[in-house]
Regions:
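Sec-dependent N-terminal signal peptides
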Residues: 5-14
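Phosphate-group recognition and catalysis centered on beta-loop-alpha active-site segments
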Residues: 18-248
Length: 248
């Protein structure tokens, strides 16, 4: 118990003097996969081939979710309860998309980990080469260390960062978020950070000039379009996932 108390005191002491004026922002990144200030909106959660073809008639890119299975296949699913006999593979998904190499893809790799990082990387590289999409695909994961293996192979990587609510003043939870993210990025270089749009203030305060990819879950009404249009004005924000039927 004593050891735990000492650790908490030390951490708290180190954090209490921090604010956005005396904390250096992390400034990166020279490589940007997509940078079109007039067309930042991509379609969120497009896990069916028919929907992909329909949305790619108006959207320049789509986001999809994949799980890597021990049978050396990626399955396109948002939930880990998928049935391999009823769920399309990433190979089938890409095979069914019209002019597949003409579009952009944000691949949310749900279960990337130390156990599957080597084999899943080989499989991803194979699919990217086969369909000619390596230069227009983002691979995203919460696992910054395993994702680094993908970055080392010149795959564009986005580190998914969870952040507690932030109103411009750093709470203890925010300080812990900041410390963790900074430490992870110092260990493993990535091309972008991805998070919910609610976290934009935190990201722009402490990760200046970093490429940002945002999703906007919950913003679906007509009035919410103004909020999303405001997100477009940030130069660091490169991609915004939306749940509307058409870009605007």
């Amino acid at each position: 118990m004593l050891k735990k108390i000492i650790v908490i005191v030390v951490v708290t002491f180190g954090f209490t003097s921090c604010n956005k004026d005396d904390l250096d922002s992390i400034q990166l990144f020279e490589k940007t996969l997509y940078d079109n200030s007039e067309n930042k909106l991509w379609k969120h959660r497009v896990n069916e081939i028919d929907n992909a073809n329909r949305y790619l008639e108006s959207f320049i890119g789509v986001e999809l979710d994949v799980f890597y299975n021990t049978n050396d296949r990626f399955y396109v699913s948002h939930d880990d309860t998928y049935d391999i006999n009823q769920t399309i593979t990433f190979n089938e998904y890409l095979s069914g998309i019209n002019n597949v190499s003409d579009h952009y893809y944000w691949v949310d790799f749900k279960n990337l980990n130390e156990t599957n990082e080597v084999n899943s990387l080989k499989k991803m590289l194979h699919l990217m080469d086969r369909f000619g999409i390596k230069k227009n695909t983002i691979v995203e994961s919460t696992n910054h260390t395993s994702l680094k293996k993908f970055n080392d192979e010149d795959i564009y990587t986005s580190y998914w960062v969870p952040i507690h609510s932030y109103n411009g003043v750093l709470s203890m939870e925010n300080l812990q978020d900041l410390e963790e993210i900074r430490q992870n990025l110092s260990e493993c270089e990535h091309n972008a950070l991805s998070s919910h749009s609610n976290n934009l203030l935190f990201l722009t305060d402490y990760f200046k000039d970093y490429n940002l990819h945002l999703w906007t879950n919950g913003l679906i009404g007509q009035d919410d379009k103004e909020t999303i249009n405001n997100l477009k004005t940030y130069s660091d924000v490169k991609v915004i996932l939306i749940d509307y039927e058409e870009p605007f």
